[in-house]
């Protein structure tokens, strides 16, 4: 950028300097003049660079404003904190004037946190940012133990959980399968989820959920069922005129016992635990209209009696220990007419 100027050294001081100046060549003068012009241009550029700039603190004529943002959810100590903003180019996004309350309505954040945490929640502190939650009452939560099985718990203040209800998807479980699953997995659920007690009032009178479109069947745990010795056996619910048939052991998938959770006919041969519960009160009417008949060992037929007295065949189940898929289809094709005539 700068041109180098050759200088001669001598032992003379001032006189030598004057002599050297006087003996400069035209090329040296031109170089000095060029250097002087360059320095002046640079000085003008640097001195005039900030003439059009205004201090960040601004003045009354500055288009940018230094405002104080008022947050309703912040402590008083945090209010009035200045937020400086730097200007941008003409094509950039215009600066946001935080002094204008129209950008942030006073109640927007308050209403947001009120809708989430309720009207009795504490506000958020700007210094600690801690949310104070109301701990009154047990907190309910749901766990999906496996696909189609949802269990609702309530956290107890003393630790552990209260088992509220169990829901089985009707697309994956019928009532009998749900009862068997509960009997086989009861101990695992109690240990895994630290179940301390059961809400008897909620479980003895379970309410039907309004969203029946989910096709969930509610089964409840009731301790009184284990204490009662007078539970009516399954065959007492059979309508008059039906042929009495009894269950036999030997199927791990379709073990003996009541279709609706009654005690098994033979406790030594059943695969269903004695902890099986009776169904909820909302299913009592279904118990009187639907039952299972064993046509032969390993073949279980579910029959329903309608309100007009007619019967319909609900399903036919085969024991996997006795029937393969092809064998079951063949058996059904051969015995379909006989089953419909005999049971319907």
Swiss-Prot record:
Claim: Phosphoprotein is one of the keywords in the record: no
Q: Tell me yes or no: is Repeat among this UniProt entry's keywords.
A: yes
Question: Region Disordered: what ranges?
Answer: 203-286
The protein's location, in the record's own words, is: Nucleus; Cell membrane
Q: List compositional bias (Low complexity) regions by residue number.
A: 248-264
- Summarize the protein's role: Acts as a regulator of cell proliferation and elongation in the root and shoot. Regulates roots architecture and primary root protophloem differentiation. BRX, BAM3, and CLE45 act together to regulate the transition of protophloem cells from proliferation to differentiation, thus impinging on postembryonic growth capacity of the root meristem. Probable transcription regulator. Regulated by the auxin response factor ARF5. Polarly localized in vascular cells and subject to endocytic recycling. Required for CPD expression and for correct nuclear auxin response.
What protein does this entry describe?
Answer: Protein BREVIS RADIX
Q: Gene encoding this polypeptide? A: BRX
